[in-house]
Amino acid sequence: MTHQTHAYHMVNPSPWPLTGALSALLMTSGLIMWFHFNSVALLMLGLTTNMLTMYQWWRDVIRESTFQGHHTPNVQKGLRYGMILFIISEVLFFTGFFWAFYHSSLAPTPELGGCWPPTGIHPLNPLEVPLLNTSVLLASGVSITWAHHSLMEGNRNHMLQALFITIALGVYFTLLQASEYYEAPFTISDGVYGSTFFVATGFHGLHVIIGSTFLIVCFFRQLKFHFTSSHHFGFEAAAWYWHFVDVVWLFLYVSIYWWGS
């Protein structure tokens, strides 16, 4: 390694941004093929390349940060700023879905019967599965905070227990959401109600899956003693992301499930 006189990480050339972009193209194209032609081949190819990219990119970052010591305090500060900006961009992303929902529901057009929910739509009961989902995500927010405090105090076993509980609650939420979709009396093609409901809750569900994956990686890293009380930004970023997912769900629940029904 050549000598450097600064605290910043000069990243080596990497193929993973390219393969990540390719997998994103394959997944989005595959989703369209699945919706319109009921073919999942392209979607499966996209998911496979995405999983391989994630595994190898995470492996490289872990090697650079944990084993090569490239993540100095200055680098960590840059990563923190990057994660904050990423979460802000996600807030704006979901703002678009809420905008579409309120644009359609606050002044329903004559085509919708002049009412919301539109004529013929039977909305889900907000006091059944959606309320259980809310409880599950709020509980996971408590357990991820417990994990963070345990890590800061150097209590490895409690951190692992709390992180495992958070992951289990995330998986449980995903299964509940899948069962709700399966039982729903309307589909994504049922006008603007179906579109806004499934796109908003579906993208949130996707973010829960991404967050759960992030936490699973952190769980295995903690098993291998990668985190210390002073050097654990990977876990901190996952916790921030999980709290963001929690807050978005609260807005979804109040807006779409409770008020929108």
Curated annotation (Swiss-Prot):
It catalyses: 4 Fe(II)-[cytochrome c] + O2 + 8 H(+)(in) = 4 Fe(III)-[cytochrome c] + 2 H2O + 4 H(+)(out). Keywords: Membrane, Mitochondrion, Mitochondrion inner membrane, Translocase, Transmembrane, Transmembrane helix. SUPFAM superfamilies: Cytochrome c oxidase subunit III-like. One of its GO terms (cellular component) is mitochondrial inner membrane. It is a multi-pass membrane protein. Disulfide bonds: none annotated. Its EC number is 7.1.1.9. The keyword Metal-binding does not apply. It is an enzyme of class 7 (translocase). Residues 1-15, 67-72, 153-155, 224-232 are mitochondrial matrix. It comes from the Eukaryota. The keyword Transmembrane applies. Pfam families: COX3. One of its GO terms (biological process) is respiratory chain complex IV assembly. Component of the cytochrome c oxidase (complex IV, CIV), a multisubunit enzyme composed of 14 subunits. The complex is composed of a catalytic core of 3 subunits MT-CO1, MT-CO2 and MT-CO3, encoded in the mitochondrial DNA, and 11 supernumerary subunits COX4I, COX5A, COX5B, COX6A, COX6B, COX6C, COX7A, COX7B, COX7C, COX8 and NDUFA4, which are encoded in the nuclear genome. This is Cytochrome c oxidase subunit 3.
